[in-house]
């Protein structure tokens, strides 16, 4: 199901395929009567969903109006296809899983300085020519962090107090400057597409507006919403959250593909001359947004898709890993919950590493042509993951299914995928759980940032003092000053910084 997409600077009137009826000429108020509208009753009955009107007689006129609008907003044919295809896919034997071929991975220890410099230069050139767009997955709330705000609004407690959104925006600003310097000071803005959800869209837009888009031009940022889908029972029937309202849930971060398609943003990218898309999740405090090295590697390899990966920290780590599905088949991500415990312990006798060691950390690069292919392919196949959850319903919380697609579902459609190994301590500081949890907290992410930046400062000839143990603190380098530790010698050499502090111009 696709709801009407609301896009900052871009609006759409059509949603997905199948002809959703939204904003019908006849208002729901004039339709509400003793019985539900005849055409609507017939539509829901055709798809076996007539239970949505089971409590009609108990509803007020206003509640009936709301229910009619809620049902009319659905593309019932599309949703029925999704439910049938997703249920049918359960229990279907999957291709045999094989490890990722070593030749598919660019490993840190095998890369030369010359290669890195060449990829960096290639990436900056493409950026300076306007060929890269950045795509941010930001539909989640910070509930697990103890906040009702969008996760990107969250501050992990750095000396600057900057939010995740601000850190990422300033990295874009820095790369724009570096790209312009590499191309005779010709400035081309990087367009930033930010996917929100119905639960975070308004707050996200207001946060950017109130902070002046963190120095970016407002017209280089586009917000768009992912869709939602009805939650369903074990027999595929819609669950009613209240007598007059469907229980719905976001369609997963993989909903980005259909959202880009239905909001016509793939066409928008093409008009802007974009050829490559850097895609990432909001909850990584060390994400290198618009990384020229990764982009240059991607262009050099000539593949349709690529992903940054880190090696599993230990066999039982709860992360999805890249695998090959079937002999000679495509690369795909296998969730840790899908792995047999014995698989997690298997060792590659040649390398001495785990056979299944390449963790997916949601740092991806795609060509625009491939994004178009994925958007059409996923829509055609209509297979969603079924997540069993407790769903709020008129009968209290009941077990049911949420229907989701994941960002990594794209890889099974890719004719060619390359994996690019990065170091956790340099590029992966996840912010998922509240402080006090055992891992992926704001505190752990903050320490990863401060330790990395402290190493940059020392490497540039600076000195650090501190009033608490250095392992618990450090210095923060503003992204406006340095992207990966460059440009710091003139600022740091011979100077002493008292941690914690932020280094700016």
Predicted regions and their residues:
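Intrinsically disordered, low-complexity regions enriched in glycine and serine
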Residues: 14-22
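N-terminal glycine-rich phosphate-binding loop and ensuing alpha1 helix
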Residues: 22, 27-219, 230-233, 239-258, ...
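Structural beta-sheet core signal
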Residues: 134-136, 194, 223, 279, ...
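An acidic- and aromatic-residue-enriched active-site/binding cleft used to recognize and process polar
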Residues: 137-141, 150, 158-159, 197-200, ...
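Residues at the starts of beta-strands that form the adenosine-phosphate
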Residues: 191-192, 220, 304, 416
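Conserved beta-loop-beta/alpha segment of the NTase-like Rossmann-fold superfamily
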Residues: 212-214, 218-317
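Catalytic core of tubulin tyrosine ligase-like
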Residues: 269, 273-278, 286-290, 295-475
């Amino acid at each position: 199901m696709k709801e009407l997409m609301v896009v900052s600077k871009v609006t759409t009137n059509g949603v997905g395929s199948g002809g959703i009826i939204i904003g019908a000429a006849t208002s729901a108020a004039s339709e509400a009567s003793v019985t539900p509208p005849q055409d609507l009753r017939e539509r829901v009955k055709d798809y076996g969903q007539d239970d949505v009107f089971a409590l009609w007689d108990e509803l007020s006129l206003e509640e009936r109006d709301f229910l009619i609008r809620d049902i009319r907003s659905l593309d019932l044919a599309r949703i029925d296809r999704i439910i049938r295809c997703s249920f049918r896919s359960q229990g279907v034997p999957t291709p045999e899983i094989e490890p990722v071929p070593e030749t598919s991975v660019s490993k840190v220890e095998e890369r030369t300085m010359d290669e890195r410099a060449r990829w960096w230069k290639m990436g900056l050139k493409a950026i300076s020519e306007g060929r890269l767009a950045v795509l941010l997955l930001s539909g989640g709330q910070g509930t697990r962090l103890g906040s009702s705000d969008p996760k990107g609004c969250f501050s992990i407690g750095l000396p600057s107090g900057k939010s995740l959104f601000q850190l990422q925006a300033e990295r874009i600003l820095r790369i724009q400057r570096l790209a312009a310097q590499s191309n005779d000071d010709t400035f081309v803005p990087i367009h930033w597409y930010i996917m929100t959800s119905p639960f975070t869209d308004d707050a996200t837009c207001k946060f950017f507006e109130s902070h002046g888009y963190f120095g970016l031009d407002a017209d280089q940022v586009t917000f768009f919403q992912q869709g939602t889908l009805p939650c369903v029972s074990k027999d595929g029937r819609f669950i009613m959250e209240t007598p007059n309202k469907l229980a719905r849930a976001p369609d997963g971060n993989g909903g980005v593909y259909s959202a880009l398609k239905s909001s016509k943003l793939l066409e928008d990218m093409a008009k802007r001359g974009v050829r490559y898309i850097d895609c990432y999740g909001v909850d990584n405090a060390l994400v290198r947004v618009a990384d020229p090295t990764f982009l240059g590697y991607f262009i050099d390899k000539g593949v349709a898709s690529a992903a940054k990966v880190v090696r599993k920290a230990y066999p039982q780590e709860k992360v999805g890993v890249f695998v090959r599905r079937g002999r000679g088949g495509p690369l795909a991500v296998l969730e840790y919950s899908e792995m047999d415990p014995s698989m997690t312990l298997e060792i590659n006798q040649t390398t001495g590493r785990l056979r299944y060691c390449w963790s997916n950390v949601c740092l991806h690069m795609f060509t625009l042509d491939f994004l178009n292919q994925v958007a059409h392919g996923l829509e055609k196949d209509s297979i969603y993951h079924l997540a069993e959850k407790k769903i709020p319903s008129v009968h209290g919380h009941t077990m049911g299914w949420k229907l989701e697609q994941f960002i990594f579902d794209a890889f099974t459609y890719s004719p060619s995928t390359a994996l690019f190994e990065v170091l956790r301590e340099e590029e992966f500081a996840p912010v998922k759980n509240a402080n006090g949890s055992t891992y992926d907290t704001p505190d752990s992410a903050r320490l990863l940032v401060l330790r990395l930046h402290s190493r940059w400062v020392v490497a540039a000839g600076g000195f650090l003092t501190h009033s608490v143990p250095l392992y618990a603190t450090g210095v923060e380098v503003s992204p406006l000053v340095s992207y990966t530790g460059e440009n710091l010698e003139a600022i740091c050499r011979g100077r002493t910084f008292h941690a914690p502090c932020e280094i700016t111009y």
